[in-house]
A protein has these predicted regions:
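Short N-proximal segments of mature Sec-exported proteins
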Residues: 24-96
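N-terminal signal peptide c-region/cleavage motif recognized by signal peptidases
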Residues: 15-20
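Sec-exported extracytoplasmic/periplasmic mature domains
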Residues: 70-78, 102-106, 121-126
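C-terminal partner/receptor-binding element of secreted or periplasmic proteins
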Residues: 107-137
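Bacterial N-terminal signal peptides that target proteins for export
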Residues: 1-8
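Short coil/turn segments at secondary-structure boundaries
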Residues: 85-89, 104-109
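Short helix/strand-capping connector loops at secondary-structure junctions
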Residues: 94-104
Length: 137
């Protein structure tokens, strides 16, 4: 029985282990930069609303979903890829991140949006290198 499960898991493991840069985005959680920037304009991240909903509502929901996506990347990478400036509270400035992404060359926007957002956060909010400790006497 165990070997049967192992054989069933092999295709899944192969798919998960493949090079993510070589495969196209698989769904709304795996966007490229173009898709992330276009989502607030075209309503593409509001598929769960259905086609009967007004386009204005789809655009509004898609815009909020794109912002939540960026804030999710920020929450998951804070302290490892970027650091909150001293005294700052609240989330990073989403509009500033969007501006950073828009400023990228068009070819960079073919890359995974999650990587682009994390890189924009790291550039805008870099972590300060740790100060070397003085030896105690």
């Amino acid at each position: 029985m165990t070997s049967h499960r192992t054989w069933l898991a092999l295709p899944l493991l192969a798919a998960l282990g493949s090079n993510s840069a070589a495969r196209p985005p698989a769904g709304p959680w795996d966007l490229n930069g173009h898709q992330l920037l276009e989502a607030p304009l075209d309503g593409s991240l509001a598929d769960d609303l259905g086609p009967q909903q007004p386009q204005e509502l789809r655009v509004m929901v898609s815009s909020r979903t794109a912002a939540a996506y960026m804030l999710g990347i920020a929450a998951g990478s804070e302290g490892a890829r970027w650091c909150r400036p001293a005294g700052q509270s609240g989330p990073p400035d989403v509009q500033a991140l969007v501006a950073d992404l828009v400023a990228l060359p068009d070819t960079r926007l073919d890359e995974r949006a999650s990587d682009l957002v994390a890189q924009a956060l790291a550039k805008r909010y870099p972590c300060k290198p740790a100060k070397p400790r003085r030896p105690s006497r």
